[in-house]
Amino acid sequence: TNTWARNARNVHQNSTQSLFGIVQGGKYKELREMSAKNMLDLDFNGYAIGGLAIGETPSERKEIVSFTTDILPSDKLRYVMGVGDIKSLLDLIELGIDMFDCVWPSRIARHGKIINRAGFFNLKNNKYKDLKEPLVIGCKCYTCLNYSTSYMRHLLINEPTSSWQFLTLHNIFQ
């Protein structure tokens, strides 16, 4: 990881793209600290916390991320790789994480699950068949501003691939 980071940093000296150093170390604080310091020495645009979502418990993950974010500068983007459930996302945002990569909003959209403040609901449920309101009242996403819940349900049932884009947009916005 350190060799890759040095090589990548050298290649991207004059690039307009952002480059992130990846902090590794598993569950071991001393390895994470060493990795973070190596990445900080290279002065990246942001820092990714890698090696998560591979078997640690949620509390272990929070401890690892909290420890690592305390080392990383708060004025640079901090990105967690591979974590995607809503509870973890909210917990990690509270710890100072700015970015994530996950498929969860899209995956659940394909199954008709719609995120709202209470969690999510299943759009396939027949009770949404005639609902003329947006998916979430007050939501300012493109889908909610332009389409009713009943129309989104119609697309999901009759033209599912057409619905996924709109439902994913909504889920990401939430």
List each language-model region with its residue ranges.
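Generic secondary-structure signature for well-ordered alpha-helical cores
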Residues: R6, N10-Q13, D70-P73, I157
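Generic detector of bulky aromatic hydrophobic side chains
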Residues: W4-N7, S18, L31, R61, ...
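Glycine-rich phosphate/ribose-binding loops and adjacent secondary-structure elements
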Residues: N14-L135, C139
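C-terminal extensions of enzymes
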Residues: G138-Q174
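Generic structural signal for well-ordered alpha-helices
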Residues: T1-R9, A36, V65-S66
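Generic structural signal for well-ordered, non-membrane alpha-helical segments
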Residues: T1, R32, R61, L145, ...
